[in-house]
């Protein structure tokens, strides 16, 4: 369909992989609501969320109004318009796309990818079934809705007209019902006006001193209302090409406007959280309808009755409220306005008529130093504990002290960063990037996984997660050839402690048993998934360019579908293919270090040889090396010990490990090291300096 215009992966910018940790059904708005649309025929309200989800609500069901969610966007949904008598919904998002939805059945029919930045605003000409979209790329595109809804897999081309001339990011857009005039508002602080039929520029209107955030046109396109961050509402005559009235009713920026059909009264809301009704014919006559508990983002008049008896209001919080306008209508009828400017206006309404309850939004997070778990705090001050690897919530901790919980869960262990976290949607979005996705290796035991043979293989967290995310993709079930497996598997080499000088021969610190265990683990990777865990099948997986443009979104469980599988073939970058399809596990990270006798030992300082080992190498292995290759060799040369009778290799190794811990101490910065620590933890928590890590050894005093 027109939805999927993708280039081959090789010709694209760097591709990242993201996924969202969430419930399968997210029933409540999890963040602010940017836009509203009411379908009076079906008594349905559509809300466009900052959590990327469009939800449908029954306005007749006060107790449980939720009907369904429309999910396809990957970032804030900034605007929506209902077209074709409520059958079609168009949405605009910060993921740079415009989407066309079947509003009755709730599925995405097609995706328009003409914008190159956030799409912030839509406008709709009801009489012509024409929609305009605009955003931060300064472009305005015109779309014929009937053409959009007719798109199919074979008929997938769509033509669009564009309106040029905007010099700054566009935040608001309006078009009259007849489709004869379109107006845009931007950070340029001016209104630009076009004729959408010819795409001709008509005029530029100056007057605002800040961003123009909301626009309305009357039916015949002769008058325009604008709301600005400068705190004013202006009424413009397009025939006279000038501002004919300015209304200063708000203390702060005006972000949302609604007007009655006759264009005699305007309802306004914004940063000051107050909603006013102003008589456009008498600038001094205005009433305070109500006061919200957060800045107002959007309003939608209930037009099912004339005059309008209610207004729906959304804010930066997740709850949507319906306020009665009956008291306003009563005032209008009686003409009994209070206009004592010296006294603050009292709101006509203090109780909402209906509430669509919202959910909590995550506003704070801390990645614990095991680089697997995250603590979060939400707008209800509730703390939760999450597992990034398994993409799930582990525990709700309730209203506990966030910082204390972080301290309580601290472990003296260092694992490199291998993912990033984003809270923009109010949910945890985890992003994996080629540059550091494979930086974190841990032992299976430390990760809480057990092997059938009792071994403790080293696991790459990023690699395991990618395999879990694409577990249902048939291409990942294909085994690589044995040759490929052998050529790319270098665990044995990477487990060694290497010297840069030949003056000291160093033993291989990976035993044959360990190598066999790791190779066995490699074989298990050739099965479906990773052999250790699965992520929830409903997890959304997103492939996107590093700059933010989404290339493809799907649910984890859907990657086995024919269409999805084909699109994955086009979209999945090579660095992900290497791990998930070819099963080429990345190499261990190495860490260089120096090993010297401690000053208190009285031993002669060695030639300063630079050693290199896996950063996961435990201190006890270095102690064994010191005991066997330095201390033991010295004592053997002094006593002339015979090596005629040798115990078994395994017994000798075990004895050596015990003797090393009994007789040797390893120090860093004069601090005695725990044999269970690995080198990366020593470097991060104890060395804490630039340059190569330096370790000192000494014999324990008897």
Indicate where each model-derived feature is located:
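Intrinsically disordered, low-complexity acidic/Ser/Thr/Pro-rich linker and tail segments
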Residues: 1-37, 41-60, 324-353, 503, ...
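Short C-terminal beta-strands that terminate individual repeats in beta-propeller domains
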Residues: 21-28, 66-72, 108-114, 134, ...
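Loop/turn segments within WD40 beta-propeller blades
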Residues: 36-42, 80-86, 123-128, 174-179, ...
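Conserved strand-to-loop turn within each blade of WD40 beta-propeller repeats
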Residues: 48-51, 92-95, 133-137, 145, ...
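WD40-repeat beta-propellers
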Residues: 54-59, 98-101, 122, 140-145, ...
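Extended, C-terminal alpha-helical/coiled-coil scaffolding tails that mediate protein-protein interactions
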Residues: 510, 518-702
